[in-house]
């Protein structure tokens, strides 16, 4: 009598490279985002005067502006308390993301997304601590309408947030 082994009796094989990733890998990626963000901010701060704008294309300028608030200058004129509020919020969010990275190491897209958010949050926290505001320098526009200036950290946060939505939609679709 031939021995048959049912599929359920065999140990599950893991052929998933994502399982081998570690939180340190994702944190290193976040650190790369921070380094790129801070590098470009330092270059802009050293070569531009406040408010200076240099055209790059017909829809993009490099500028040097400061944001004491959050996205779209939310609470920028709130009197100063917002610097420490957003600094504290960035630190809390960063700590939460590190915890998430330890809990979900096998979820590559999720970890990639939150690593981008972590790097962006840390980049902007550094600005708030060092300068008292966030340094923004990317200015996209169409005719006379200018999108609020932003930076590499903001790009990372935005792309990370979009990827989190994509990851969640993929997860919901599977179930």
Swiss-Prot record:
PROSITE patterns: SPASE_II (PS00855)
EC number from the UniProt entry: 3.4.23.36
GO molecular function, one term: aspartic-type endopeptidase activity
Alphabetized UniProt keyword annotations: Aspartyl protease, Cell inner membrane, Cell membrane, Hydrolase, Membrane, Protease, Transmembrane, Transmembrane helix
Keyword NADP: no
GO biological process, one term: proteolysis
InterPro entries per record: Peptidase_A8
Membrane-spanning residues: 25-45, 56-76, 81-101, 110-130, 146-166
GO CC aspect terms: plasma membrane
Catalytic activity: Release of signal peptides from bacterial membrane prolipoproteins. Hydrolyzes -Xaa-Yaa-Zaa-|-(S,diacylglyceryl)Cys-, in which Xaa is hydrophobic (preferably Leu), and Yaa (Ala or Ser) and Zaa (Gly or Ala) have small, neutral side chains
Record carries keyword Cell membrane: yes
Pathway: Protein modification; lipoprotein biosynthesis (signal peptide cleavage)
Localization in the cell: Cell inner membrane
Membrane topology listed for this record: Multi-pass membrane protein
Active-site residue list: 136, 154
Entry function: This protein specifically catalyzes the removal of signal peptides from prolipoproteins.
Protein name: Lipoprotein signal peptidase
Annotated organism of origin: Cupriavidus necator (strain ATCC 17699 / DSM 428 / KCTC 22496 / NCIMB 10442 / H16 / Stanier 337) (Ralstonia eutropha)
